[in-house]
């Protein structure tokens, strides 16, 4: 008997900007109940990959399945089950924290009592209770990041996509965010997190993919990555990362199939 579909499947994803490759032949699978890390140097293609997964970018080729559904064919069917925190967030300065999360919750069509209970819990856990009625323009960078994170999880998503979620957040706030991430997986959901904080990724993620120059250099548990990098058993994720992202680490991928386009080409 076949088990449930993986939370997320990415198949042979390609994306170019002005003819320059950003993502080349990416394939990965995220299991239910796991935290999957996406790490790589600047410009490796992590953010582009995540934007395609959440439907903000269209790939040149490839397929993305969420709970077995092709999101390119059904772009709205899956979105209620996904939470997304982009790398760069823009929040409405002249709303309060309460007003902003209320707005997000209503967009998500959350029942009023459920929304209010969830907001109270998130404000408490993220240490935003005191400033919750202050205008966002008065928030520090770390407070804004925590509020944006709260917006991404307000509806208790089954698939949470996080792009550099801990930037500018103090240690206590980082701990709270990581606890909420673990709560998602305890509920049977899945999390994909892109981060440059390798020590955090090593402790938080069940499996990881190392991206380099638009391709995946290695993927698996830390033990798997150590094997791919041919390092010792005591090697840290940083040691493995540096070895795998050396210039010769990733072979040039083959070109995507010719004359097969998901979207019409301009005349």
Predicted regions and their residues:
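Conserved ABC transporter NBD signature motif
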Residues: 62-73, 78, 82
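Conserved ABC ATPase "signature" region
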Residues: 102, 106, 113-131
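Conserved catalytic motifs of ABC-family nucleotide-binding domains
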Residues: 156
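Catalytic Walker B motif of ABC-type/P-loop ATPase nucleotide-binding domains
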Residues: 160-164, 169
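Helical segment within the ABC ATPase nucleotide-binding domain
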Residues: 174-187
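ABC ATPase "signature
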Residues: 219-220
